[in-house]
UniProtKB/Swiss-Prot annotation:
GO terms for cellular component: ribonucleoprotein complex; ribosome. SUPFAM superfamilies: Translation proteins SH3-like domain. It comes from Geotalea daltonii (strain DSM 22248 / JCM 15807 / FRC-32). Belongs to the universal ribosomal protein uL24 family. The keyword Aminoacyl-tRNA synthetase does not apply. GO terms for biological process: translation. This is Large ribosomal subunit protein uL24. Keywords: Ribonucleoprotein, Ribosomal protein, RNA-binding, rRNA-binding. GO terms for molecular function: rRNA binding; structural constituent of ribosome. Signal peptide: none annotated. One of two assembly initiator proteins, it binds directly to the 5'-end of the 23S rRNA, where it nucleates assembly of the 50S subunit. One of the proteins that surrounds the polypeptide exit tunnel on the outside of the subunit. InterPro entries: KOW, Rib_uL2_dom2, Ribosomal_uL24, Ribosomal_uL24_KOW, Translation_prot_SH3-like_sf. Part of the 50S ribosomal subunit.
Length: 108
């Protein structure tokens, strides 16, 4: 079963608008539509403690954890802030996401 369509895509630059990492920006690494979640580079870092296995020693690994998609907004480089998006249809029928404030296209 497919998940929902989310307002962000992989490699988008987003701003966190809620939670402990509020106001941080980062690139979307992975989309998880079934959980309504995303992984953002450098945001919501958690520590994973691993036990020693064979020749490997135990360690503490830091990695990104999933955050809910409603806690992020797309970053517009032209407006220099987090913005809402609108979908516009081009003359050739292709749909693109654009900034509501300035009209900058995010899908090229």
């Amino acid at each position: 079963m497919l998940g929902k369509k989310l307002h962000v895509k992989k490699n988008d630059t987003v701003v966190v608008i809620a939670g402990k990492d509020k106001a941080k920006t980062g690139k979307v690494l992975q989309i998880l539509p079934k959980k309504d979640g995303i992984l953002v580079e450098g945001v919501n870092i958690t520590k994973r403690h691993t036990k020693p296995r064979g020749s490997e020693s135990g360690s503490i690994v830091e990695k990104e954890a999933v955050i809910h998609v409603s806690n992020v907004m797309i970053y517009c480089s032209k407006c220099d802030k987090a913005v809402r998006t609108r979908t516009n249809t081009l003359e050739d029928g292709k749909k693109v996401r654009v900034c509501v404030k300035c009209g900058e296209a995010f899908d090229k």
